């Protein structure tokens, strides 16, 4: 057993012989519980078969000069474990003894008690950078839901816990009683990673895996630091560790919004995004809904703009001239270019922006929405099989959007893929619109798994995915049109995907959404609230206003989903009963007006340009929302809070999303602003009332 002393208060006990982290100690208190192999390696054959070899299956040789030596029948491994700046830095060098491919290496794995804090006899929580950020407090609940733990493999699922897809940053943390364990892979090349947690016997294992970027039979040498650190605080302090590294290792060319002269003017005007289908009522429906012809929506959009006293963006679904959600060919638009162009021109004359959903790196063999599309077999004729993502054994299969289409995922390493997608997206960007959600269904912006040995990339997931995707995006002639993806853009794509369709609401299936993404990246990119698909909070009057408040506080632009009557749905593809219940449109518009007025005026420097910081404490009552399973409650404070820093000023926004006043108490005295013009200020306040559906700002 080796005791690695990190600080005067922190020590890590590592049992190198048994290959496990035995103890994580802070001020004498043990933070972990039990143990798991502290490293594992996955090897893959060309047939697609694989095996995982863990530290438990390796023979320990020696630990000398901060390097542990292991051997096995498949590989020899040198593991650097060294104290640096109050943390343990880990690196693995692997000598491959086989002709198999080293697919990934898992490092620094540790276990905690098998129940989290919201379970009987549970403790602790997991900070998880999934879909803009999540605090997980009930492991059994997570495992009972659609976003449970899944071992990633081919073919990709769009729920995989993969960076840079649903996972936006390269770390994860465990919190217990104000102390945390941070795992981070500080990789400036941003290779593909699996960042996750799962049951391990009767415990929970927290781990990170890096894909190795090597070919069959090749060795692997980790080119970055894997960091294990104990810290005091909450999720903000875990994020601070990562933010410190990120700030010194940003993606090339990434600029803060305040410095970025290439962002269009409308970005700073915070338009309300109005999502609606040109036809149909949900993903797989195309029946007339009253919103076609295109211009039918203009009076509804004008009314929304007038009542919110701000800009709006019409973000269209089901506009494709081929079939809804049937990539890659979508142009010309439904009804023809002339009619669409006339709509865009008239919308712009009324200061209404126009955006389009587009379906990313996919190929449609047969639409399930319009079964007559396509009318030929282009897959065979064009030899598309040569450019689709495939398994090691040549199998081709896709699990993405099967209700909408039968098809495949395209591999961005192939020049034909780039050429097809660039050609199609160029047509959209030349149509005088303002925004394209270019990579809907490619969550976070990245491609899906491909193991082909014929595409010119290493025959497994790896850094080539983000490199080739960025090349694809760079080749689009945007003409000033902003691009985005589904879920917030992951770290490698921040420069090119600057306005994306957030998916924080998916985290209700896992735990509690937290604005982790905004805390890390808000200075560089503002997104929008998103179409809220699968937002499964019970339909109470403060359901939608809560989600508006959450997005506002996270620094994002707001969204409504409009139906053919001009009413607002709780979410796109809304299936939460009662299905016919709609948002109170009048109160929603009034609240949006209040929020956007703050965002465009008194709070603009913070909410548009600022760096999110840890907020000061606020005491208030709580609200409870019943979740989809009919027995679990999501508990939220009666006000939503977020704090920002800009130009040496710090401000916190406190939002009451309820239809009743809320009494609050600040942890310290502050100056309080009650209006977005900053004309009504009360000095040195600590307790006060926040009016229904209102915002206050405190400076501290």
Regions found by a protein language model. Name each.
Residues 274, 312-316, 354-357, 436-438, ...:
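Hydrophobic faces of well-ordered beta-strands that scaffold small-molecule active sites
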Residues 209, 219-224, 425, 462-681, ...:
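Active-site-proximal substrate-binding groove within the catalytic cores of carbohydrate-active enzymes
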Residues 4-313, 346, 350-353, 435, ...:
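Carbohydrate-recognition beta-sandwich/jelly-roll modules
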Residues 294, 339, 345, 353-428, ...:
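Active-site-adjacent "subsite" loops/lids of carbohydrate-active enzymes
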Residues 320-321, 358-364, 442-443, 487-491:
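Active-site-proximal loop/turn and secondary-structure-junction residues that shape catalytic pockets
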Residues 409-495:
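Active-site neighborhood of glycoside hydrolase catalytic domains
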Residues 289-305, 417-429, 544:
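Short, acidic/polar
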Residues 272-295, 323-338, 401-420, 452-466, ...:
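The substrate-binding groove and active-site-proximal loops of carbohydrate-active enzymes
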């Amino acid at each position: 057993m080796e005791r690695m002393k990190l600080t005067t208060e922190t020590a890590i006990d590592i049992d190198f012989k048994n290959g496990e982290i035995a103890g994580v100690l802070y001020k004498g208190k043990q933070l972990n519980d039990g143990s798991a192999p502290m490293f594992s390696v996955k090897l893959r054959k060309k047939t697609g078969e694989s095996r995982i070899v863990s530290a438990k299956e390796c023979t320990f040789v020696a630990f000398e000069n901060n390097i542990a030596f292991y051997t096995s029948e498949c590989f020899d491994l040198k593991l650097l474990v060294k104290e640096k700046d109050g943390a343990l830095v880990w690196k693995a060098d692997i000598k491959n003894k086989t002709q198999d491919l080293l697919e990934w290496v898992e490092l620094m794995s540790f276990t905690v008690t098998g129940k989290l804090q919201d379970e009987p006899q549970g403790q602790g929580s997991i900070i998880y950078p999934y879909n803009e950020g999540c605090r997980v407090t009930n492991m059994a609940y997570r495992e009972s839901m659609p976003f449970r733990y899944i071992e990633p493999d081919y073919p990709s699922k769009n729920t995989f816990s993969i960076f840079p897809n649903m996972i936006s940053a390269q770390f994860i943390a465990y919190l217990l009683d104000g102390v945390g364990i941070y795992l981070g892979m500080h990789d400036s090349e941003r290779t593909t990673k699996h960042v996750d947690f799962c049951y391990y016997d009767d415990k929970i294992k927290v781990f990170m895996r890096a894909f190795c970027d090597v070919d069959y039979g090749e060795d692997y040498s980790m080119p970055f630091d894997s960091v294990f650190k104990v810290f005091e605080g909450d999720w903000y302090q875990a994020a601070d560790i990562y933010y410190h590294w990120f700030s010194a290792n940003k993606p090339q060319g990434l600029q803060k919004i305040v410095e970025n002269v290439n962002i269009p003017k409308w970005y700073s005007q915070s338009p309300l995004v109005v999502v609606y289908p040109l036809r149909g009522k949900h993903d797989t429906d195309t029946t007339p809904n009253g919103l076609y012809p295109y211009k039918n929506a203009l009076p509804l959009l004008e009314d929304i703009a007038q009542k919110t006293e701000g800009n709006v963006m019409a973000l269209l679904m089901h506009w494709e001239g081929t079939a809804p959600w049937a990539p890659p060919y979508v142009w010309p638009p439904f009804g023809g270019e002339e009619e669409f162009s006339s709509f865009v021109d008239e919308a712009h004359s009324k200061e209404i922006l126009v955006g389009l959903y587009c379906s990313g790196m996919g190929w449609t063999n047969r639409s399930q929405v319009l079964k007559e599309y396509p009318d030929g077999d282009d897959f065979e004729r064009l030899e598309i099989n040569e450019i689709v993502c495939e398994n090691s054994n040549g199998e081709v299969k896709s699990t993405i959007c099967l209700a909408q289409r039968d098809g495949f995922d395209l591999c961005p390493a192939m020049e034909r893929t780039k050429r097809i997608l660039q050609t199609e997206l160029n047509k959209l960007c030349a149509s005088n619109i303002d925004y394209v959600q270019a990579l809907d269904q490619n969550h976070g912006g990245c491609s899906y798994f491909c193991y082909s040995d014929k595409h010119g990339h290493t025959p497994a997931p790896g850094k080539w995915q983000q490199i080739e995707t960025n090349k694809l995006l760079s080749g689009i002639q945007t003409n000033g049109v902003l691009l985005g993806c589904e879920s917030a853009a992951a770290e490698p794509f921040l420069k090119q995907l600057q306005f994306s369709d957030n998916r924080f609401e998916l985290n209700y299936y896992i735990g509690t959404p937290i604005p982790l993404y905004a805390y890390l990246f808000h200075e560089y990119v503002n997104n929008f609230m998103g179409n809220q698909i699968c937002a499964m909070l019970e339909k109470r009057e403060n359901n939608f206003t809560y989600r508006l408040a959450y997005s506002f506080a996270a620094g994002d632009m707001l969204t409504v989903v409009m139906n053919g009557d001009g009413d607002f749905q709780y979410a796109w593809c809304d299936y939460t009963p009662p299905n016919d219940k709609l948002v109170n449109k009048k109160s929603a518009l009034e609240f949006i007006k209040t929020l956007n007025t703050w965002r465009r005026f008194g709070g603009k420097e913070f909410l548009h340009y600022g760096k999110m910081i840890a907020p000061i404490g606020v005491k208030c009552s709580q609200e409870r929302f019943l979740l989809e399973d009919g027995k679990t409650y999501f508990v939220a404070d009666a006000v939503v809070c977020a704090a920002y820093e800009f130009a040496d000023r710090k401000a916190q926004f406190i939002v009451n999303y309820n239809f009743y006043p809320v009494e609050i108490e600040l942890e310290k005295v502050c100056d309080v602003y009650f209006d977005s013009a900053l004309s009504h200020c009360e000095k040195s306040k600590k307790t006060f009332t926040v009016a229904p559906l209102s915002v206050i700002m405190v400076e501290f």
